[in-house]
A protein has these predicted regions:
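Generic protein-terminus/edge-of-domain signal
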Residues: 1-43, 52
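Short beta-strand segments in beta-sandwich/barrel cores
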Residues: 25, 40-46, 59-60, 68
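A generic beta-sheet turn/junction motif
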Residues: 31, 47-49, 74-76
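Short acidic-glycine-tyrosine-enriched beta hairpin
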Residues: 49-64
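Ligand-binding loop in jelly-roll beta-barrel domains
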Residues: 65-95
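An amphipathic alpha-helical interaction segment
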Residues: 97-163
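Terminal helix-turn-helix DNA-binding modules in bacterial transcription factors
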Residues: 168-173, 178-180, 187, 191-210
Length: 210
């Protein structure tokens, strides 16, 4: 589903795709915004700023140019909407996990295969306008986002912690590994991720438990 060069001829293009467990899409980006909705299954989306867990009836909004890779953790069916960036001024301005209402999912399903040359004042045009209105008010689900630390030493720790999630990690462990004070760890971690270490660890464990 890479479609790196896809540029919608209309405000919106919808693609439906089936993935099998273990499939991956390497790092890539798009010239338009993208909304990936999981109809059923489970995928992990990784960007330079974090990891995002996407399960059934949830989605991820990726802004234009956001580099991302996909890891399919369970047989998954997705709907992917490619949105022309200039079609609305008030679309979400950052990549984030979002809740998907039954209405939006039904509208997107109806829009699969719509001819890019549809006319105004037609059923197709009205469906597209309704979808664009729904995209303006997507509800973020921050608990499914795990921000990526920016400093290399913390990024290396992320891998170590991920490999031993059952360990009762504490600030003291991180301070000892980095040979700095707990206070410094707490401050630097919050500066890099916007979260306390405890909240970040809770989200990471939640993501791996899904």
């Amino acid at each position: 589903m890479y479609f790196q060069s896809l540029q919608p001829q209309q405000p919106l293009s919808i693609v439906e795709k089936q993935y099998e467990t273990g499939m991956c899409e390497p790092l890539h980006s798009h010239v338009c915004h993208q909304l990936i909705i999981v109809k059923h299954g489970f995928i992990r989306v990784t960007t330079p700023t974090g990891q995002f867990a996407i399960t059934q009836n949830r989605g991820i909004w990726l802004t234009k140019g956001t580099e991302h890779s996909l890891t399919i953790l369970k047989n998954t069916q997705v709907l992917s909407a490619f949105v022309e960036p200039l079609t609305r001024a008030d679309l979400p301005n950052r990549s984030q996990v979002v809740a998907i209402s039954e209405l939006l999912q039904a509208l997107l399903g109806s829009a699969v295969g719509i001819d890019s040359h549809y006319q105004t004042n037609t059923r197709e045009a009205w469906i597209v306008e309704l979808i664009l209105d729904e995209l303006r008010c997507l509800t973020p689900l921050a608990e499914f986002e795990v921000p990526q630390p920016t400093l290399p030493e913390y990024q290396a720790l992320l891998e170590k912690i991920s490999e031993r999630l059952s360990h009762p990690w504490a600030l003291a462990d991180i301070a000892n590994l980095l040979n700095i004070s707990e206070r410094t760890v707490s401050r630097q971690f919050t500066q890099q991720t916007g979260l306390s270490f405890i909240e970040w660890l809770r989200r990471l464990r939640l993501q791996h438990s899904l």
